[in-house]
């Protein structure tokens, strides 16, 4: 698509890449829903495949009584960013991502936190101050695992959106710009 002037940072949810992925994936999800209806109609289905919302919608279209929901790992990544900022700014050690409480809003790859706390500490003022102090250089991930390198970014788009809207964008910059052309 790029040679035609269509740019996509990821292409698994939105744009032509998302449409192509949906066309490839939906037929498989029809078969999955039929198999669940036939062999395990009481099972819960947890979907991590993209385009997530279309995959889950297909399951319900084929088998309306199915118990299914979709998840995205991006929320965990943003909890890790909050963990790192908390450790860096407050001098805390060994903060566990799982101990950061959040309220998640939105759709896959375009999720937001309107609440974030750690052991009773409201993280919004800490995050606000950090985004102001690091609006140019962003946040550098402490995780140097090569398997996570494709998700690495400085979170500058995330910081900018927080300053504009007052909510923490809970997806990586590469996904956020899919939904907001011209940002970043």
Predicted features along the sequence, with ranges:
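Long, compositionally biased stretches enriched for glycine and/or charged residues
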Residues: 87-184
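Short C-terminal domain-edge/linker segments immediately following a structured domain
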Residues: 14-19, 76-80, 132-137
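Generic detector of bulky aromatic hydrophobic side chains
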Residues: 1, 18, 24-27, 52-56, ...
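A sequence-composition feature that detects small, non-aromatic residues
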Residues: 14, 19-22, 33-43, 68, ...
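Rossmann-fold NAD(P)-binding glycine/threonine-rich loop
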Residues: 2-63
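Rossmann-fold dinucleotide-binding core
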Residues: 34, 44, 48-118
């Amino acid at each position: 698509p790029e040679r035609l002037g269509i740019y996509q940072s990821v292409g698994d949810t939105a744009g032509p890449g998302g449409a192509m992925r949906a066309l490839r994936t939906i037929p498989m999800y029809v078969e999955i829903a039929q198999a669940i209806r036939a062999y395990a109609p009481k099972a819960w289905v947890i979907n991590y495949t993209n385009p997530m919302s279309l995959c889950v919608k297909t399951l319900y279209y084929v088998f309306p009584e199915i118990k299914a929901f979709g998840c995205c790992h991006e929320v965990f990544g943003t909890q890790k960013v909050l963990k790192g900022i908390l450790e860096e700014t407050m001098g805390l050690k060994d903060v566990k991502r799982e101990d950061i409480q959040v309220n998640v809003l939105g759709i896959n790859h375009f999720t937001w936190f309107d609440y974030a706390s750690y052991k009773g500490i409201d993280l919004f003022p800490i995050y606000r101050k950090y985004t102001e102090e690091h609006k140019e250089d962003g946040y550098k991930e402490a995780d140097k695992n090569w398997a996570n390198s494709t998700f690495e970014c400085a979170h500058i788009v995330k910081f900018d959106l927080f300053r504009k809207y007052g909510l923490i964008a809970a997806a990586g910059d590469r996904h956020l710009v899919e939904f907001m052309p011209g940002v970043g």
